[in-house]
């Protein structure tokens, strides 16, 4: 396997199955973060991930971390929390605030650079990137953002300024997504936090099959309109 150099004259990506094993999933370098290129990348299960000072790096890891929405795990402590919380969640009400908060949360080694923020803001304005906000006393305390691919949602990052806020964002979103016909949430790479929520790993080829199956099927009307999300029910 070799690392591919993207052409500035073409939006074409190499086959994700040609990604390197070490580092896991690294596929290509270069190109840009235009809306057109990001759309082309997500259609093939590829996403950008790089640190300040690095060139743009494109990834498609194997295995892939995913959440089948009906397999979301809610811990006993979270169930107790949901009975007494003071949160409410919204959709697409404060995208810029959410992505900046995600960048700040990971400031010690963030991959959410100013380039990424600008690119995903344009993707949001194009109707492809979306945010979930969690509020407490009218203050933004948690949230997440990602990219929709039909009935599949590619989660990018989440943040929490108080206990359980990011978990609440995911709970409220997955309920909303299922209600509107969503089938799969892509979490890219497994970590301890997402594993505790029921995220699991599947082989890349199975993920790509799921992507092909769901990305050209639309969710129900109204799914991505700015709105308040319903309380999570268990």
UniProtKB/Swiss-Prot annotation:
The UniProt entry's GO CC annotations, sorted and at most eight, read:
cytoplasm
Q: Which molecular function terms from Gene Ontology are attached?
A: leucyl-tRNA--protein transferase activity
* Assigned keywords, A-Z: Acyltransferase, Cytoplasm, Transferase
One GO BP on record is: protein catabolic process
Enzyme Commission number(s) of this protein: 2.3.2.6
Catalysed reaction(s) here are: N-terminal L-lysyl-[protein] + L-leucyl-tRNA(Leu) = N-terminal L-leucyl-L-lysyl-[protein] + tRNA(Leu) + H(+); N-terminal L-arginyl-[protein] + L-leucyl-tRNA(Leu) = N-terminal L-leucyl-L-arginyl-[protein] + tRNA(Leu) + H(+); L-phenylalanyl-tRNA(Phe) + an N-terminal L-alpha-aminoacyl-[protein] = an N-terminal L-phenylalanyl-L-alpha-aminoacyl-[protein] + tRNA(Phe)
InterPro entries in the cross-refs: Acyl_CoA_acyltransferase, Leu/Phe-tRNA_Trfase, Leu/Phe-tRNA_Trfase_C, Leu/Phe-tRNA_Trfase_N
**What is the protein's known function?**
Functions in the N-end rule pathway of protein degradation where it conjugates Leu, Phe and, less efficiently, Met from aminoacyl-tRNAs to the N-termini of proteins containing an N-terminal arginine or lysine.
Put simply, this protein is called Leucyl/phenylalanyl-tRNA--protein transferase
